[in-house]
């Protein structure tokens, strides 16, 4: 299994798009991931996909699943590549750590249904199911002693998340693994 580091959505989603080079750009204290110089955030993913193949489309699962069959079919008609983003697990992780486990079960059922739609309605034959990143969860919360306090970064961090910290190039904190 390969994964981009850190294993968070903005890096993982960008890595799944066609590109020659991924870069991180810090603007106004906000870190963005670019594919060949283009933003990979949200609806920009469709633009990046179309740069590689104009007969492509990027869609959200939650949007297409509520559509009628004819509406869905019209969106993908004539397309050579269709990306469908599904975020049941990610959405659950932002609201409750314990809901992630049931969200995994829900996601499997939803993706199985989506494959049925792709095969039966879109006549899809090549289906690739992948994930933008992994996750580690336990039913037991982490002890405070297992966590790194953000205040020890002393203005060195570019971005700090629940599972990662991105530091300025050349930073050498003794409590983090450089990647």
What are these regions (language model features)?
Residues 1-179:
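Feature captures the catalytic ectodomains and active-site-proximal regions of enzymes
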